[in-house]
């Protein structure tokens, strides 16, 4: 996570699994994509998932809090998962690639990116994201959505960005405890 732009950072180049450097089976990460294992004690210590994120960034927030608690996270490059439903019928591939293929998800993506930044980065960096990067990304994502015939997606991205900026002005978001049962 780039603390100035809120763009994701990879510890290794964004390569297909087959093209990763030879011998790399574990590499450090703060992100916990679609399948992961965490000891229950660690899950409880960091408070589980923050359910206020709704739909996107909850895994990133969880991974970041694990790192802040002094634990390390790794991606096992030899593990395989099947993730069905990547491109549902009616979805535009370019919008799906950006994570903005559905209106509600788009709203949550734009809003939660700013909430995540407010929770995890310095105030100066939050201002950089909220006042420079978020408006620029709003223009970009809006343009891509309109170019793909989805002005509704553009409006939802704008609405989510504005809500995220307002949330940033309110202060750091609270942790909403996970409802996962013990």
Segments (PLM) and residue ranges:
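Acidic/His-rich active-site region of diverse nucleotide-sugar glycosyltransferases
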Residues: 1-47, 51
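A short, conserved alpha-helix in the catalytic core of glycosyltransferases
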Residues: 30, 34-47, 52-80
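Conserved acidic
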Residues: 58, 105, 153
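Active-site donor/metal-binding and catalytic loop motifs
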Residues: 71-72, 76-97
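A short acidic, glycine-rich active-site loop
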Residues: 95-107
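A conserved mid-domain beta-alpha-beta active-site/ligand-binding segment of alpha/beta enzyme cores
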Residues: 110-114
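Non-catalytic, C-terminal membrane-associated alpha-helical segments of glycosyltransferases
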Residues: 122-182
């Amino acid at each position: 996570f780039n603390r100035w732009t809120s763009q994701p950072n990879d510890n290794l180049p964004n390569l297909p699994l087959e093209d990763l450097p030879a011998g790399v089976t574990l590499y450090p990460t703060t992100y916990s994509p679609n399948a992961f294992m965490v000891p229950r004690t660690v899950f409880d210590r960091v408070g589980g998932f923050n359910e206020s994120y709704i739909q996107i960034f909850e895994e990133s927030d969880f991974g970041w809090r694990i790192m802040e608690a002094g634990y390390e996270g790794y991606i096992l490059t030899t593990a395989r998962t099947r993730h069905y439903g990547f491109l549902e019928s009616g979805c535009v591939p370019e919008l799906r690639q950006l994570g903005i293929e559905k209106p509600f998800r788009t709203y949550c993506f734009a809003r939660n990116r700013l909430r995540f930044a407010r929770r995890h980065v310095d105030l100066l960096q939050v201002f950089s994201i909220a006042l420079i990067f978020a408006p620029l990304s709003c223009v970009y994502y809006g343009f891509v959505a309109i170019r793909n015939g989805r002005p509704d997606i553009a409006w939802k991205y704008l609405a989510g960005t504005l809500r995220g900026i307002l949330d940033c002005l309110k202060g750091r978001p609270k942790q909403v405890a996970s409802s996962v049962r013990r």
